[in-house]
UniProtKB/Swiss-Prot annotation:
This is Ribosome maturation factor RimM. Keywords: Chaperone, Cytoplasm, Ribosome biogenesis, rRNA processing. The PRC barrel domain binds ribosomal protein uS19. InterPro entries: PRC_barrel-like_sf (IPR011033), PRC_RimM (IPR056792), RimM (IPR011961), RimM_N (IPR002676), RimM_N_sf (IPR036976), Transl_B-barrel_sf (IPR009000). GO terms for cellular component: cytoplasm; ribosome. Belongs to the RimM family. One of its GO terms (biological process) is ribosomal small subunit biogenesis. It comes from Burkholderia thailandensis (strain ATCC 700388 / DSM 13276 / CCUG 48851 / CIP 106301 / E264). GO terms for molecular function: ribosome binding. Residues 1-39 are annotated as: Disordered. It holds the Pfam family RimM.
Amino acid sequence: MAGHDSGSAKRGRSPSFGVFVRKPVERAPTKGAGDGAADSEAIRIDAAQPWPDDAVEVGAVVDAYGLKGWVKLVAHAGAGRGGDALLKARDWWLQKGGERKFARVTQAKLHSDAVVAHPAGSVDRDTALALRGFRVFVRRGDFPALAADEFYWVDLIGLDVVNEAGVALGKVADMIDNGVHSIMRVEYPATGKDGRPTTGERLIPFVGVYVKAVEQAAGRIVVDWEADY
């Protein structure tokens, strides 16, 4: 959201598509007045391609690639993981500040630790350079399908967390990858030492020992975890 997005509760594997974490995007060099707009005019949002309700930010354009209009992107979740959505989706929505564009991608592939792609209408290096700094969004519906015991983090964030006794533990506010397995960061209403309302936090490993069920339709995750842990 990151923002990579998936993990396995049963096997405790590292996520194959984790939370989206925005990475710094190098600012494009300033060009002459009107040059950038002219170069990228062929790639734009129009009434036929409205911004989708399920748009998820998955990466950003960082440079041109070659001379034929290809762009180089960094996937917020890491190439090969966040890259999965960038590679599969053929419709991209681009945003930089208040400017939005639509791009139909004709080809996309992994290149070293990045993703390179050719948007239709990007005909040369100058056109590609004009897209530097644009954040890339794809529809959640265009994400690759996962196995039954895998989940995209973007689908877990916001779910209620309850234990097996039905005690509410809070909501998933974030997902963390510690290199071994995923961890849910759960927030809940609490009271501070001064008696004022505050937000408490629980860190629950997203592994089968603790996660007993992910009930997306019901909007909750059932865990073997006590409120006083």
